[in-house]
From Swiss-Prot:
UniProt protein name: Superoxide dismutase [Fe]
Record keywords, A-Z: Iron, Metal-binding, Oxidoreductase
Enzyme Commission no: 1.15.1.1
Family assignment from sequence similarity: Belongs to the iron/manganese superoxide dismutase family.
């Protein structure tokens, strides 16, 4: 089964002025596409060829893992943003954030710190463990919290290709822009599932 580059859940210019059309053209159309194409080449003729993406992530390593995880991480990341995003979470998610982190502001500060201070390429995550406890963490390169038994709720890509066109080396500005488009409905859906 060949994997395909999924369409973005919005138009290329829909996240402007926070994330530019040019960034999405390169990030989605070139970087994400390259992960999908490389993954398909690597799994061709192997037992992974018929496996679902999440199983490949759990069972593989090396190049297959890196490209499978980057495909999953990016697909998830696109849905973590919306042109109607930003603002604050509500309902059960807001309550869980308050209970775990003390307040939305404290959660945002912790997540922002995790994203801004992550050394090198990787991802900042809001996850839920098997006991339903929320946690902020960062992973290096293509790592995905699923490999540690944690459920991703939200992620911010902190690879330089995610922001260099728009903010050059100013990752904090990019992370601030990310907050303006966070898709809390998607995060809530992940929290409830």
């Amino acid at each position: 089964m060949a994997f395909e580059l999924p369409d973005l859940p919005y138009k290329l210019n829909a996240l402007e002025p926070h994330i530019s059309q040019e960034t999405l053209e390169y990030h989605h159309g070139k970087h994400h596409r390259a992960y999908v194409n490389k993954l398909n080449k690597l799994i061709e003729g192997t037992p992974f060829e018929k496996e679902p993406l999440e199983e490949i992530i759990r069972k593989s390593d090396g190049g297959i893992f890196n490209n499978a995880a980057q495909h999953w991480n990016h697909t998830f990341y696109w849905h973590c943003m919306s042109p109607d995003g930003g603002g604050d979470p509500s309902g059960e998610l807001a309550s869980a954030i308050d209970k775990t982190f003390g307040s939305l502001e404290k959660f945002k500060a912790l997540f922002t710190d995790s994203a801004n201070n992550h050394f090198g390429s990787g991802w900042a995550w809001l996850v839920k463990d098997n006991n339903g406890k929320l946690e902020v963490l960062s992973t290096v390169n293509a790592r995905n919290p699923m490999t540690e038994g944690k459920k991703p709720l939200m992620t911010c890509d902190v690879w330089e290709h995610a922001y260099y066109i728009d903010t050059r080396n100013d990752r904090p500005k990019y992370v601030n822009n990310f907050w303006q488009v966070v898709n809390w409905d998607f995060v809530m859906k992940n929290f409830k599932s």
